[in-house]
């Protein structure tokens, strides 16, 4: 800190000014003439501040944390403690990612110089991303940044390669995990959603400089969906819905470009589950909403005018009814802001599918089971009517 924050100003004794003619009280009578002149002195408030007082920090401010990151990792005895402290900080203050990630990566480049250290770093980030539900998105962004800025590249593999190897270890146990006990399934679901975030955020630069997504993750997500639908328990199906809400539009676009019909097959699996599986009514309602969402192009608005495609330039209603988001500094922005269009679309696609549920499945409307509490005793009339039509249509198709 600067010297102005290190110590309080030194205190000096107030000096009394010598009396002047203006200080004397006028004589009123002969008796008062014999009185001594009175001097008016401005009152002095004696401060209790001390030059030796400790520095003041607002409540909730961690001076050790800030000093440690200003000084790098000197105050941390191990890499694990340094990284874990930073991960916890990002979990509590995700808005600090942009301002602190560069310094974090530079510090890691000076510390992570061996295969073992790189493996430890990958494991720490993986565990944080799969054990803290709200960190899966931030963890994926962190992985993407480090994959491009960590300089170490040992024979065992660089950061991205080791990360994908760690994910593959969990992926290979998908069939057992999907039918395991509740704790095993919960851990598996956290992995599935983290892999979905990785697919959206992990950028791979090609030889010509083009940026693409990891195709291996796309294949993995397809197989993970198969595992979830093959074991149609409520929590497995909820996980599948969340994954498709998160990645469905991107997956379908990619499959269509390759001439694949994987999304059609997935929707057929969902229809079979709605008709045949013994899942709860609320979960069936969620699945029907997902089918409806997909039929509307995953909620993406592609309005067209009579003669030409609608654009911000030719359609004054282009941005009507679009939601408003806010930056980490509280500045609002909409789809009409050119500086935030890419970020806006990303947030729009990440909007929670279930308005009464947090990302970790907690019901915001009240206490109880985060997944299985009934949202309502009965379906909404509109949903119930749609459900009946859906069942009749599916039955008709079967008989054909």
Curated annotation (Swiss-Prot):
<dbReference type="InterPro" id="IPR051367">
    <property type="entry name" value="mRNA_TranslReg/HistoneTransl"/>
</dbReference>
<dbReference type="GO" id="GO:0070934">
    <property type="term" value="P:CRD-mediated mRNA stabilization"/>
</dbReference>
<dbReference type="InterPro" id="IPR016024">
    <property type="entry name" value="ARM-type_fold"/>
</dbReference>
<dbReference type="InterPro" id="IPR009818">
    <property type="entry name" value="PAM2_motif"/>
</dbReference>
<protein>
    <recommendedName>
        <fullName>Polyadenylate-binding protein-interacting protein 1</fullName>
    </recommendedName>
</protein>
<comment type="function">
    <text>Acts as a coactivator in the regulation of translation initiation of poly(A)-containing mRNAs. Its stimulatory activity on translation is mediated via its action on PABPC1. Competes with PAIP2 for binding to PABPC1. Its association with EIF4A and PABPC1 may potentiate contacts between mRNA termini. May also be involved in translationally coupled mRNA turnover. Implicated with other RNA-binding proteins in the cytoplasmic deadenylation/translational and decay interplay of the FOS mRNA mediated by the major coding-region determinant of instability (mCRD) domain.</text>
</comment>
<dbReference type="Pfam" id="PF02854">
    <property type="entry name" value="MIF4G"/>
</dbReference>
<dbReference type="GO" id="GO:0106002">
    <property type="term" value="C:mCRD-mediated mRNA stability complex"/>
</dbReference>
<feature type="compositionally biased region" description="Polar residues">
    <location>
        <begin position="12"/>
        <end position="32"/>
    </location>
</feature>
<keyword id="KW-0963">Cytoplasm</keyword>
<dbReference type="InterPro" id="IPR003890">
    <property type="entry name" value="MIF4G-like_typ-3"/>
</dbReference>
<dbReference type="Pfam" id="PF07145">
    <property type="entry name" value="PAM2"/>
</dbReference>
<feature type="domain" description="MIF4G">
    <location>
        <begin position="80"/>
        <end position="297"/>
    </location>
</feature>
<keyword id="KW-0810">Translation regulation</keyword>
<feature type="compositionally biased region" description="Basic and acidic residues">
    <location>
        <begin position="1"/>
        <end position="10"/>
    </location>
</feature>
<feature type="region of interest" description="Disordered">
    <location>
        <begin position="356"/>
        <end position="376"/>
    </location>
</feature>
<feature type="region of interest" description="Disordered">
    <location>
        <begin position="1"/>
        <end position="36"/>
    </location>
</feature>
<comment type="subunit">
    <text>Interacts with the RRM1-RRM2 and C-terminus regions of PABPC1 in a 1:1 stoichiometry. Interacts with EIF4A.</text>
</comment>
<dbReference type="GO" id="GO:0005829">
    <property type="term" value="C:cytosol"/>
</dbReference>
<feature type="region of interest" description="PABPC1-interacting motif-2 (PAM2)">
    <location>
        <begin position="37"/>
        <end position="64"/>
    </location>
</feature>
<feature type="region of interest" description="PAIP1 middle domain (PAIP1M)">
    <location>
        <begin position="78"/>
        <end position="296"/>
    </location>
</feature>
<dbReference type="GO" id="GO:2000767">
    <property type="term" value="P:positive regulation of cytoplasmic translation"/>
</dbReference>
<dbReference type="GO" id="GO:1900152">
    <property type="term" value="P:negative regulation of nuclear-transcribed mRNA catabolic process, deadenylation-dependent decay"/>
</dbReference>
<feature type="region of interest" description="PABPC1-interacting motif-1 (PAM1)">
    <location>
        <begin position="361"/>
        <end position="400"/>
    </location>
</feature>
<dbReference type="GO" id="GO:0003723">
    <property type="term" value="F:RNA binding"/>
</dbReference>
């Amino acid at each position: 800190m600067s010297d102005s924050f290190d110590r309080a100003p030194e205190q000096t004794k107030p000096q009394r000014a010598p009396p002047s003619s203006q200080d004397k009280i006028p004589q009123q009578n002969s008796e008062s003439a014999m009185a001594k002149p009175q001097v008016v002195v401005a009152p002095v408030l004696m401060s209790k501040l001390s030059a030796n007082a400790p520095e003041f920090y607002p409540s909730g401010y961690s001076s050790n944390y800030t000093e440690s990151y200003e000084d790098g990792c000197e105050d941390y005895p191990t890499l694990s403690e340094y990284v874990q402290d930073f991960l916890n900080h990002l979990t509590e203050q995700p808005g600090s990612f942009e301002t602190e990630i560069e310094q974090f990566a530079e510090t890691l480049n000076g510390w992570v110089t061996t295969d073992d250290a790189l493996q430890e770093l990958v494991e720490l980030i993986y565990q944080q991303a799969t054990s803290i539900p709200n960190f899966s998105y931030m963890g994926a962004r962190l992985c993407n940044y480090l994959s491009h800025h960590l300089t170490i590249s040992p024979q065992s593999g660089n950061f991205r390669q080791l990360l994908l190897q760690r994910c593959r270890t969990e992926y290979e146990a998908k069939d057992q995990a999907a039918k395991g006990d509740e704790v095993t399934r919960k851990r598996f679901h956290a992995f599935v959603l983290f892999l979905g975030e990785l697919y959206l955020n992990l950028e791979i630069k090609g030889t010509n400089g083009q940026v693409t997504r990891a195709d291996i993750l796309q294949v993995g997500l397809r197989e993970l969906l198969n595992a979830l639908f093959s074991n149609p328990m409520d929590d497995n199906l909820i996980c599948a819905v969340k994954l498709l809400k998160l990645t469905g539009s991107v997956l379908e676009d990619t499959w269509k470009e390759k001439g694949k019909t994987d999304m059609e097959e997935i929707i057929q699996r969902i229809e079979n589950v709605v008709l045949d599986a013994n899942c709860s009514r609320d979960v069936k309602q969620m699945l029907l909403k997902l089918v409806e969402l997909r039929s509307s192009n995953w909620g993406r608005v592609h309005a067209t005018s009579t003669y030409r495609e609608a654009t911000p330039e030719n359609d004054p209603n282009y941005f009507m009814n679009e939601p408003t988001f806010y930056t980490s500094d509280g500045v609002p922005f909409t789809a009409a802001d050119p500086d935030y269009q890419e970020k806006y679309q990303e947030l729009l696609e990440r909007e929670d599918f279930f308005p009464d549920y947090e990302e970790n499945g907690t019901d915001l409307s009240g206490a109880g089971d985060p997944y299985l509490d009934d949202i309502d005793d009965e379906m909404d009339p509109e949903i119930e009517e749609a459900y009946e039509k859906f069942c009749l249509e599916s039955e008709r198709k079967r008989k054909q």
